[in-house]
């Protein structure tokens, strides 16, 4: 595993090529499908439309729940950041690392391991964004980071199957307690979909594992750009045949909201005080990047009149 600024290693490039070959086969298969057909097809889990509804949603009056005012009166779809906003990645990864350590007789600080894995996410993803690596699925990026931190933490003796199973912990993350119920409420009034940097198979597995009631799956893989690239946010409106102002980005991270707002999406901050653990520093106070602020998805549903 090479650090940012260094040439990719042979191992990195081989891993990327294996993922890229499967990716290219899938893209060729769907190259002739229009956006609307793509959304409605529901094939191979790419964009699996179920009951998509948009009932002319009205907007949020921030001081008073349920009051629907400008500037979000035209919102018809909500798209969600997933890691940290919908699912509790830190607790989930920590528990699986603890279980693995117990089975293998390892001594490891599982919470620090989870934090280190997540800390590698941005820098490794930026190697794709800045052209150092070709387009690479998040599963492959997670594997690159994992192989490095296994060495950093002195963990050896894992089989290929054990390493692969650990890498796929990101497919098995647990939702926040309010997530499924809150999303179900919001679905009654809006189109709801993830807009994540996670690849489509990852998002599909998460939805099935946790019962996330998405209408369809959107995200970085469909446009081969990672957030905060504007192409990802624009694609949400394009795939849903909506104007950007008819789409609201929901996230626990102000940086995500700033990027979305820069493209013209409406925005909602949902705070997750424990995303980074009891001593973390999450975004808890909205700024001008947030049109709406809520303490969880049920609170957001009330504020949006769902």
Region annotations inferred by a language model:
Residues 66-119:
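Active-site neighborhood of HAD-like aspartate-dependent phosphohydrolases
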Residues 81-84, 146, 194:
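Generic structural signal for small/hydrophobic residues in well-ordered secondary structure
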Residues 53-63:
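Signal peptide processing junction and immediate N-terminal pro/mature segment
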Residues 37, 95-99, 116, 144-148, ...:
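Alpha-helical elements of Rossmann-like donor-binding domains used by nucleotide-donor carbohydrate transfer enzymes
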Residues 1-33:
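N-terminal secretory signal peptides
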Residues 104-105, 114-164:
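A metal-dependent, Asp-based hydrolase signature
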Residues 160-209, 217-220:
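Substrate-recognition element of Asp-dependent hydrolases with the DxDx(T/V) motif
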Residues 18, 27-42, 46, 64-75, ...:
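Asp-based, Mg2+/Mn2+-dependent phosphohydrolase catalytic module
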């Amino acid at each position: 595993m090479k650090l940012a600024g260094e040439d990719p290693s042979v191992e990195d490039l081989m891993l990327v090529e294996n993922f890229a070959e499967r990716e290219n086969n899938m893209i060729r298969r769907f190259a002739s499908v229009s956006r609307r057909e793509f959304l409605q097809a529901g094939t191979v889990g790419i964009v699996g439309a179920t009951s998509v509804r948009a009932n002319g949603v009205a907007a949020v009056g921030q001081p008073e729940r349920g009051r629907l005012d400008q500037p979000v009166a035209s919102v018809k779809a909500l798209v969600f950041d997933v890691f940290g906003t919908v699912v509790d990645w830190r607790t989930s990864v920590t528990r699986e690392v603890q279980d693995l350590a117990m089975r293998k007789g390892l001594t490891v600080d599982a919470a620090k391991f989870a934090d280190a894995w997540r800390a590698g996410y941005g820098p490794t993803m930026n190697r794709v964004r800045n052209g150092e690596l070709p387009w690479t699925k998040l599963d492959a990026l997670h594997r690159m980071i994992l192989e490095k931190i296994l060495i950093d933490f002195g963990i050896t003796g894992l089989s290929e199957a054990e390493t692969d199973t650990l890498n796929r912990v990101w497919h098995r993350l647990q939702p926040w307690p309010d997530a499924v119920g809150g999303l179900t409420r919001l679905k009654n009034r809006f189109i709801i979909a993830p807009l994540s940097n996670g690849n489509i198979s990852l998002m599909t597995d998460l939805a099935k594992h946790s019962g996330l009631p998405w209408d369809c799956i959107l995200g970085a893989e469909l446009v081969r750009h990672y957030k905060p690239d504007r192409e990802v946010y624009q694609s949400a409106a394009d795939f849903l045949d909506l104007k950007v102002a008819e789409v609201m980005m929901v996230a626990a991270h102000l940086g995500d909201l700033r990027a979305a707002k820069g493209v013209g999406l409406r925005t909602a901050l949902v705070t997750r005080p424990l995303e980074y653990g009891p001593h973390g520093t999450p975004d808890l106070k909205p700024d001008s990047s947030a049109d709406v602020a809520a303490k969880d998805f049920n609170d957001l549903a009330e504020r949006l009149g769902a």
